[in-house]
């Protein structure tokens, strides 16, 4: 995955790891003015087309696997199942991305429609829609703020745990990456791991969690009921089809969605060129600019371009995915050196970031003491 090697764009040259500037000379208004007006239009018909398209593709994958893999000789079936898992997880991640767009009111002009579609899609993929919508909103409002960001908050050198030092070797990095990719999102939802530190235990299922305010608590409970309904449906499927069938056809692809989601967001927010800010330096546009686009090759399209339009998304989150590339290209001349896309092959980038981005510290000789950069051990 990842194109690698294409260097025609000045935002992706040899110095891709070079730090971005920290004092943008433009405003959000300047960026919006550069984007064609039609890019802000949200069509419920066009958005719904992508939902239907992905559902049809997901059904085709299901039908082929359910019908033909049981007919394949056992040794070959062991190869066929991972192919199904990858394909189904990929298309389901596309549906998850559409649910995420609903949370940003980028699906249609009607908030109710957005919330209904997002609630159904995310619940089916075991994500508490409203709960995650609200915590994710906090992330967008406080991106790369060391004091207030909701997730992906790196540690200072003095706070690095002993196990991080023990795992600072090739086998340890592989273990850390596998753990992060498979369990990172479920543990974030359940225990707020890697999330903002609150005065008490926080998770995404407790309506009284400090993550949420009083106006959001009823909808958090609604998210829980949505998941309970899905778990009840899973129970009925296990009774009818057996646990092995449910695991192969549904559970592993849904786990794959979590893997893809963590992989994408980890790479968007973890890079040697990206700063973090304390309260003396942070403002909204500085934080929103502190992300990087990535190239997932053919999966860019499957994931509805969320992989390589993330910088735009953090600046203007309500632009629908089918206008995102055009809008991104429109603001790139304004962004200049503040925009970066890293086309390093994904597995190589994953390992590099796990090796190089361990903790953050400000530069000792810098006048910006509230600007923090990644370092390795």
Curated annotation (Swiss-Prot):
Chief location category: membrane
EC number: 1.14.19.-
Domain writeup: The histidine box domains may contain the active site and/or be involved in metal ion binding.
Gene Ontology MF terms in the entry: oxidoreductase activity, acting on paired donors, with oxidation of a pair of donors resulting in the reduction of molecular oxygen to two molecules of water
Entry's localization field: Membrane
Protein name from the UniProt record: Delta(12) fatty acid desaturase DES8.11
Biochemical pathway: Lipid metabolism; polyunsaturated fatty acid biosynthesis
Pfam (any one): FA_desaturase
Keyword Nucleotide-binding: no
Record membrane topology: Multi-pass membrane protein
Transmembrane segments: 55-75, 79-99, 112-132, 174-194, 220-240, 244-264
Stored InterPro entries: FA_desaturase_dom (IPR005804), FAS_N (IPR021863), Fatty_acid_desaturase (IPR012171)
Residues spanned by motif Histidine box-3: 310-314
Keyword Metal-binding belongs to the record: no
Gene Ontology CC annotation, any one: membrane
